Amino acid sequence: LHLSLRRQRQMCIRDSNTAVSVAAEALDRLHTTGETHHRIMVLEVMGRYAGWIALESAIAGGADVALIPEIPYDINKAVEKINERREEGKNFSIVVVAEGAIPQGGTITVQNVRNNGAGVDNNKLGGVGQVVAKQLEELTGLEARTTTLGYVQRGGTPTAFDRVLSTKYGAKAMELALEGKFGVLTVIKNGKLDSVSLEDVVGNNTKIGAVSGNTAESNIRKVTMDHDLVKTARDIGICLGD
């Protein structure tokens, strides 16, 4: 499940445990080839205009750099981090890049601009991992390789956490239907199962994700700078590109 709200307050209808687990496992595997071949391994992950998957997997998978849409990055900051590691005798680095990551003063990387005519954003994001890898290779002199997980993150066997969560949501949805309550979405609110009107969720969000300059005009729930994940990443030395 991966649906996010700007008006979340104490509401949570977003979880991506399986996707994060897949990305973290990929990072575990990339450590091996990165270390043995003295390379910069760049992993591009999904998430559209939000950096939840990138940030969580970077923490879980021991990445050195994590670039997310919410923090426009300065590639030189990533270079500094990589060079610091080299001075410590670590001739490889792991970089996680969210597909919606944006360079400072730049624009989002879009493979294909698509619009259904009703203002709905169907842009195909992707490719920023290659851009970052090329820049890092040129600026550090180290080989850089890119891995893009893409839809691998969305398939396969879900984690036990996601199985339990989806079952809880499904049971709650059935309960609501039997009560004749329609047009609602099951959520976790204040730690308990609840429901919210679809109108509150969707509202005017049919025109989400319109990219203007370097700004993704959307109503999705993004990582905030005071979130504990941001603090944790910084505390353990992950460079966020700023």
Positions of the model-derived regions?
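Single conserved hydrophobic/aromatic residue that forms the stacking wall/gate
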Residues: 1-13
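Histidine-centered active-site/metal-ligand motif
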Residues: 2, 37, 151
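Short, ordered loop/turn segments at secondary-structure junctions
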Residues: 6-7, 70-73, 99-102, 149-154, ...
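Short beta-strand elements at the ligand-binding edges of bilobed clamshell
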Residues: 10, 14-18, 157-163
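Accessory alpha-helical/coil subdomains and C-terminal extensions
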Residues: 16-35, 44-143
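Generic beta-strand structural signal
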Residues: 39-41
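C-terminal non-catalytic interaction/assembly regions of soluble proteins
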Residues: 124-242
